[in-house]
Amino acid sequence: MNKQELLHMIKQSNRKRLLQRLFLAIPAALAVYFLIRTDGNIWVGFAIIGGVLLATRYFLSHEADAISRLSEQDQVKRVVTLQYHLDFLFITLLALVNPLAIRIMEWSWIPAVLIGGALLYILWAQEKLDQQIRWLDPEQPTRREIRRF
């Protein structure tokens, strides 16, 4: 299969999972609300966000497995898996650390700087990993190409 056929196949698969991802957004927003609220019980937010993070981890690992199967090289498979681990790390950072930092430091700019710095670092790391994939296997679709297609 050439790169365009692989991209088309990935896009069809992502459309099937879109509804599942949208259903995760509602409990995630509710959990962040409970984590930020200073007068409520924080454990409700932890329970909800824990379930959302487990489901997100399942979906991301399933997607990483599907995309890494497109290449026969072990190094490419490791890089693809690492990219999805970074995505999960950033989602966890957004879901747990940021609301708790906002809860503790209500009127501070520190949580925004932490999240902004983490976002820039992860975007930089993703770009470097995409470059490595292009170098290892030119026919393997990169994350950027998958998002654009």
Label the model's feature ranges.
Residues 6, 66-88, 146:
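Short membrane-interface loop/juxtamembrane segments of multi-pass integral membrane proteins
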Residues 32-40, 97-106:
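Juxtamembrane "helix-exit" motif on the non-cytosolic side of transmembrane helices
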Residues 43-54, 92-98, 108-119:
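Hydrophobic core segments of alpha-helical transmembrane domains in multi-pass membrane proteins
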Residues 51-70, 124-133:
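Membrane-water interface of transmembrane alpha-helices
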Residues 104-132:
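Hydrophobic alpha-helical transmembrane segments and immediately flanking/interface helices
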Residues 77-102, 117-122:
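Hydrophobic alpha-helical membrane segments
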